[in-house]
Amino acid sequence: MTRSIKKGPFVDAHLQKKVDEQNAKGTHNVIKTWSRRSMITPDFIGHTFAVHDGRKHVPVFVTESMVGHKLGEFAPTRTFKGHVKDDKKSRR
């Protein structure tokens, strides 16, 4: 179920405050955040966020195509090591 249009996008207040401060100053420093649930809004474009994946902070540079998605979508939490192609070599 999607979020109601009348409610608007959810962005953590502390994260929005940091973005507004940087936009006012005209700087684009990396913003470290644990808020994977925050939706990317148009004023986030051009900023780099360090999104926490449970172990480390993954840098995410926001572009126009990311607007409407959540920050957590661009910082995967699970690492896929890959499937073993042929198990016969390891059995020897």
From Swiss-Prot:
Keywords: Ribonucleoprotein, Ribosomal protein, RNA-binding, rRNA-binding. GO terms for cellular component: cytoplasm; small ribosomal subunit. GO terms for biological process: ribosomal small subunit assembly; translation. SUPFAM superfamilies: Ribosomal protein S19. PROSITE patterns: RIBOSOMAL_S19. Coiled coil: none annotated. Pfam families: Ribosomal_S19. One of its GO terms (molecular function) is structural constituent of ribosome. Belongs to the universal ribosomal protein uS19 family. Protein S19 forms a complex with S13 that binds strongly to the 16S ribosomal RNA. This is Small ribosomal subunit protein uS19. The lineage of its organism: Bacteria, Bacillati, Actinomycetota, Actinomycetes, Bifidobacteriales. The gene is rpsS.
